[in-house]
């Protein structure tokens, strides 16, 4: 083995296989771009993003880890979300939960 050597599997990797998803229409009502990372608790994103927040409590974007979605001012698009898993406790972000979902 060579340091840093990779042994990739063949074929495609399906993200969040078997997990329930929700599609939500999101609009940036602000005058600045808003970027949301892959593991950010979507319920707590920038208030300039308009959508049904109650529907997305405990969810994050269904995109590869380390990536993000950018909403330009006036943009409206549909995003796919998946539930947070594990202990389903949320701390930090914008401080709206600070505990169990």
UniProtKB/Swiss-Prot annotation:
Any one annotated GO CC term: urease complex
GO biological process: urea catabolic process
Primary localization: cytoplasm
GO molecular function: urease activity
Pathway assigned to this chain's UniProt record: Nitrogen metabolism; urea degradation; CO(2) and NH(3) from urea (urease route): step 1/1
Claim: NAD is one of the keywords in the record: no
Reactions it catalyzes: urea + 2 H2O + H(+) = hydrogencarbonate + 2 NH4(+)
Classification via CDD domains: Urease_beta (cd00407)
Superkingdom of source: Bacteria
Enzyme Commission (EC) number: 3.5.1.5
Pfam families xref list: Urease_beta
The entry's keywords: Cytoplasm, Hydrolase
Subcellular location as annotated: Cytoplasm
Keyword flag Cytoplasm: yes
Family: Belongs to the urease beta subunit family.
Oligomer status and interactors: Heterotrimer of UreA (gamma), UreB (beta) and UreC (alpha) subunits. Three heterotrimers associate to form the active enzyme.
This protein's name: Urease subunit beta
Higher taxonomy: Bacteria, Bacillati, Cyanobacteriota, Cyanophyceae, Acaryochloridales
């Amino acid at each position: 083995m060579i340091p840093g050597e990779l042994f990739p599997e063949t074929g495609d990797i399906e993200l969040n296989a078997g997990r329930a998803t929700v599609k939500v229409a999101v609009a940036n009502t602000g005058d600045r771009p808003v970027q949301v990372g892959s593991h950010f608790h979507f319920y707590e994103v920038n208030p300039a993003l308009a959508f049904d927040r109650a529907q997305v409590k405990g969810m994050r974007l269904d995109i590869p880890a380390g990536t993000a979605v950018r909403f330009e001012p006036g943009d409206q698009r549909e995003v796919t979300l998946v539930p947070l898993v594990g202990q389903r406790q949320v701390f930090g972000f914008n401080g709206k939960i600070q505990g169990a979902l």
